[in-house]
Each structure stands twice: as C-alpha cells, then as structure tokens.
Regions:
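Intrinsic low-complexity, intrinsically disordered segments enriched in polar/basic residues
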Residues: 2, 95-96, 524
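Sec-dependent signal peptide recognition
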Residues: 3-10
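Processing junctions and N-termini across compartments
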Residues: 13-14, 162
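C-terminal motif of bacterial Sec signal peptides marking the signal peptidase cleavage site
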Residues: 16-19
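Short, surface-exposed linear motifs at loops/turns and structural transition points
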Residues: 21-122
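Carbohydrate-active catalytic/glycan-binding domains of CAZyme proteins
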Residues: 120-650
C-alpha cells in the first residue's frame, strides 16, 4: 500500500510538472509589435501598418481616437493577420487622430507606440494653373497600358505588353523605357531565362507549407511546338505593396490553347529589375496529369485525378485564360486580382498581402455547373462575361463611392470592334451592373459588339470609334479600337482614363491616349471629349462650382454620339453633327431639344431623343492652344454617351 501511495504521489508530481511545462509553453512567446506607422493620409482615410506577434492571440488590430492614448474601448479595426495593413476610413477632414495597435490574449493586452496624424483639408475645388498645353504632347506606343503613380518621384508609369513601358511627370510627355528582368545570377536576364525558376518555392495554406516550383515558360510551351516567349509577355499590372516593401508586377505569360499563367515579379525600384517570384493563377489543365505541375492540389487538396469539370473541350466557354491581371487594394485594405480573357469570363481572387500571391486560406465554394460557372474552387468568383462572349482587360478602380469595372469587348485589331464598357458596384467583388442595371455577369452567350450585338448593349459605352473630331482625330488619324485601358484616381485630385487606340488609316499602329474623367450627377463616369493637355479642373469641383458660365454656353457646337453597334468591318465611325445651343435653353440644328445647367455646379443636362446628364468644362482643342466649352454626358437608360464642343470664335 505504501508503494502504491508513493507511486501515486510521483505520478501527481509528474502531472504537475507537465502541467507547469505546458503553461510555460503557452506564454513563452510574449505579445509584441514592430513599430506602428501611418501612411497614405488623405482627407477621410489613412493606412496603419504594424506586425503583431505572440502566442495564443485572440484579437489584434488598431484603435484610434481624436484624444491621446486610444484604447480598445475607442474605435477599433480588427485584423486576422499578424502583418496588419488596415485602412482607417470615414475620418473627418483636417482633424488630428491618435492611433495605437493592440494585441490581446486570454490573459494580456498590449499596446504599441502611439502615432498621431492630421487628415488633409477637404478636396480642393480650385483649378490648378494650366502651365503646359498641347505642345507638351509626346506620343508613345504601349499596348494594353496599365497606369501607376510613383509617389517618391511624382512620376506616372504605363506598363504594357511585350515589355513596352513609358513614364511621364505630366501624362503628356512620355518617354519609353524597358524594365529589365532579374534571376539569381543576373540583373539583366533574357526572356527565356526569366520565367523558369521562381524565387519562392513554398507557399502556405492553413499553416502548412507546400512545395510549388512552377516553370512558367515550360507550361506555356505546352500549347504549341513553335512557341516564342518574346510575343507572349502580355498586359502586366504594377502596384506598390507596402507590406512587402516591393513593387509587384503581375505579368501574363500567355500560351496557346489556354496554357497560360499570371506570375508575380518583384523589384525594389519601379523601373526594375523584376524577378520572378511564383505563379498566382494558372489555366489550361484540362487533360491527363498536367494539373500536377500547377498549384491545383494546394488549392483543392490532393486529387486522385483531374476533377471532371475541368476535362472539357469548352474551356474557353467556361473558364478563363489566365491573363490580363488587375491588382488593387479595396477600401478595407484587402488585396484583390481580377483577370481573364477572352471568352470564359472575368474572375476574381483575393491575394495575400504578405506574399502578393494567391491567398490560399480563402476558399471558393462551387456555384453553378457546366458552362454556367459563377464561382469555381480554383479560379475564384466570376464577375463578368462568360459563355464565349467576348471580354478581357478588366480594370477596377474605386472612384467617388463605387468600384468601377472596365471590360473591353470585341477583337483588338483596328476593324474588329474593340471597345471599352463600364460597370460599377458597391463591393470590390461585385455584383457589377451598368447604368441600365444590367449585370456584367452573363446568363448565356450573347454577341456583345458590332452591328449584330444582342446583349441589350450591356456596359456604358464610355467612348467608341470616332472621327472628324476637333483638329487631331480626323481622316486617317480618327480613333478606333480603343481599349485595354486602365484608370487612376490620381493624387492631384483628378481621374484619368488611359488606353491604347488604333486609327482609321494607320494599319495596326497604336498609341496611348489619356482623357480626364468625371462623375456625372448620377455618379456615372463620363470622359472628357478631348485628350488631356494639362487642364487643371479638379474632380471635387464639378458638383460645387460652375466652370463654364451660363453666358458662355450658347453657340454652335459639334455634337458626337457614341453609338453601339458600329459596323467595324466596314470601318464605320461615329461622326459629329452641328447643333446650336440657344440662349433660351433650346437646341436647334441637326438635332433638337433643350439644355439646362444645375445652379452652382458644372452639371449640365442636354435633352435630345434622350436626356444626357453630364458636365461642361473648358478644354484645349489639341494640337492648337484653342479653348472651348466642352460637354460630356450619359443617358443612363441606354448607356449611350455624347460629346460636344463649341466652335471657335462663336
């Protein structure tokens, strides 16, 4: 009995020691932070960045107040990641805020250092002086231009297909350059070497590491026997990732028969060199064991064979070609990528801010079947198109309360109907609708461009093929096949639409064009009728300042309607007619109607067959230094836009 008692006592001591050891393990990593920083401060928001570490964390985030030493009892934002990048939104203008990060366990609460910042005053409605004009225009050819602004040098960049790129400090004078590629052994690697060996070879899902060594070049070679990488580096999108402290280029490595991938390349400087990190998404695994070369099993789990839904001869009707990325942060600080071309629809994935790659911890439950896919476990959520209807070059930008989605329909050649369409949503991942409330996501196949378009003319027709307009877009230089655009709500208080255009009589030659964009009274985007040449009108001024005096409006105008269903094969263009805006508010001439100004604003309505709600501003009629009142407007019931400009010397 004594021996049993002694044995029980020893066991009890052992249990106590074990329990104590377990307790020590629980608290051995203290709660801690890297230094909290605040950046991107503007009128109503700011971005807080910090890293929270420690064991058994229950909550982490930032708290803020207009008084010093904020606590978790004040306004707070929670984070599910240790590397926190949180956007403080809804702030008052010209107000000082105090911010602290916090991390909490079951037994402890720790705060970071305190940072204070003052939001900017409300957006300026004062025009910037126009210090330059049409003489500053220096053209550049960049196909599929994606625009990005480098705050450190106050320089705009456009990156495009086939390694074309250019930079400008005024969006008018462009200088071309080529960003070099890097590998482990070279800072100026060849195209054939740059995409074979990723720097990142492991990714994490659910806390577990998985090997991922993807040769992007070898994958795209599967589509053809005579593959040439030099013509297949398509449509990059470049963004600054503050968590990674890197410039991130998302580049399409295109291959025939959908053997394509979007890869991440990073650089310390925006002009490179860029080094291949890892794939973000891959397409084309529809036969055999090809999927074993991709990250499909990391996303879905181990598969005995390729899932039946991917074994299809209708890949282009159901799934995307993994090209044409658009990467952006939403207003809550999440990182997203929309992508896809040309016929399977536009899809969207959430990315990991720490790696810039796919967020493998976000799952996508299958929705839909057959060709009617709405959500795919691998490709993500479909937000537009599908069923072999055309659509590519998605671009999403948050402007004035909405996420705007641009998609380009049609074929990219000069006479194949390339044309931008616009949708919007309150959420980054949709649903996206046009001004008629028609969805960007299609329920079946439609012809969605050209004279036989039968989709109800989905998507605002922000501009299309046009000619005999002003002094530049005339005759053989008339614009057509405009598309694969990007758009930027720029730090100068203006929004710019950037696209490439072909021309009526110049073959397949193309150039970049930039137009300022405004929101009309209904919040839809309308593009200025002429190329940007340094006009200083701020977006915030449109709703509160009348830029063109009522007395300056009457006179003779050229009026151009951007029509749907142009016959591009027949080289059809939209061309202007002559009308007169009379002082009594009537319109006479080739079309008749009325016009009116909303008092105290630049909002103008022109009623013809429909009512076009838009804005009236002064523009320069490039290439001359001739200024004129110009109108741009949208009839939201049809999606049709119109432009008008007043004749000189009226």
């Amino acid at each position: 009995m004594k021996h049993i008692t002694k044995l029980l006592m020893l066991l009890a001591i052992g249990l106590v020691v074990t329990a104590c050891k377990d307790k020590i393990d629980e608290v051995e990593t203290e709660l801690a932070f890297t230094t909290l920083s605040v950046s991107s401060v503007n009128t109503t928001s700011a971005t807080a960045t910090a890293k929270a570490t420690g064991s058994h964390i229950t909550y982490r985030g930032v708290c803020y107040s207009t008084s010093p030493n904020p606590t978790v009892n004040d306004t707070k934002i929670l984070s599910d990641r240790s590397n926190m990048r949180l956007i403080l939104s809804g702030l008052a203008t010209h107000t000082t805020y105090y911010v602290r990060a916090f991390v909490q366990s079951n037994s402890n609460l720790v705060y970071s250092n305190e940072v204070s910042f003052t939001t900017l005053s409300g957006p300026s409605i004062e025009d910037d002086p126009q210090t330059e004009g049409p003489s500053a225009l220096k053209r550049v050819s960049v196909h599929d231009p994606s625009v990005v602004f480098d705050h450190t040098t106050s320089t705009y960049y456009v990156f495009g297909s086939h390694r074309a790129a250019a930079k400008s400090n005024n969006l008018m004078t462009w200088n071309a350059f080529t960003a070099p590629w890097a590998t482990e052994s070279s800072s100026n690697a060849s195209n054939t070497d740059a995409f074979t060996t990723p720097q990142v070879t492991k990714v994490t899902k659910g806390g577990q590491e998985y090997d991922l060594v993807f040769d992007a070049l070898a994958w795209s070679k599967k589509g053809s026997t005579d593959y040439d990488i030099s013509g297949n580096m398509w449509a990059p999108d470049v963004i600054w990732n503050p968590t990674m402290n890197k410039w991130c280029m998302y580049l399409s490595i295109n291959g025939d028969h959908h053997f394509s991938s979007i890869i991440l390349m990073t650089a310390d400087k925006i002009e490179g060199p860029y080094r291949y990190q890892a794939p973000v998404v891959i397409s084309g695994f529809y036969t055999g064991t090809d999927y074993k070369s991709t990250d499909l099993e990391i996303v879905l789990g181990e598969q005995a064979s390729l899932p039946e839904r991917y074994k299809t001869s209708n890949w282009g009707k159901r799934y995307p070609n993994a090209i044409d990325p658009c990467v952006f942060y939403d207003e809550q600080g999440k990182l997203w990528m929309s992508y896809g071309s040309w016929s399977g629809g536009i899809y969207m994935l959430e990315l990991n801010q720490q790696t810039g790659l796919r967020n493998y911890d976000v799952n996508y439950a299958q929705q839909g079947s057959g060709d009617d896919i709405k959500v795919d476990p691998y490709f993500g959520k479909k937000i537009a198109g599908g069923f072999y209807a055309s659509g590519e070059a998605s671009y999403i930008e948050y402007i004035g309360g909405y996420y705007y989605l641009f998609v380009t329909n049609g074929g990219l050649s000069a006479f194949e109907g390339y044309q931008m369409r616009v949708f919007r949503s309150a959420n980054p991942d949709g649903p996206y609708v046009d001004s008629k409330n028609d969805a960007a996501l299609l329920p079946q196949y439609y012809m969605n461009y050209g004279p036989t378009e039968n989709d109800g003319n989905r998507g605002e027709n922000i501009l299309g093929a046009y000619g005999q307009w002003g002094y530049t877009a005339v005759d053989r230089a008339s614009e057509r096949a405009q598309g694969h655009n990007s758009i930027i709500a720029a730090p100068d208080g203006r929004t710019y639409l950037v696209y490439h255009t072909r021309f009526q009589g110049m073959g397949e030659g193309h150039e970049v064009r930039v137009h300022q964009v405004y929101q009309n009274e209904e919040g839809w985007l309308v593009a200025a009728p002429f190329e940007y040449t340094g006009e200083g009108v701020k977006s915030a001024a449109i709703g509160s300042v009348q830029k063109v005096a009522t007395s300056d409006i009457p006179g003779k105008y050229k009026l151009l309607t951007h029509r749907y269903k142009l016959n591009h094969v027949a080289q059809e263009l939209s061309t202007p007619v002559e009308v007169t805006l009379n002082a009594d508010g009537t319109i006479s001439g080739a079309q008749t109607g009325t016009w009116s100004v909303k008092e105290g604003s630049s909002y103008v309505n022109i009623t013809l067959d429909k009512t076009y709600k838009g804005v009236m501003i002064w523009q320069t009629l490039e290439p001359k230094d001739e200024k004129a009142p110009c109108f741009t407007g949208l009839d939201s019931s049809t999606g049709v836009t119109v432009w008008a400009y007043k004749y000189a010397n009226n």
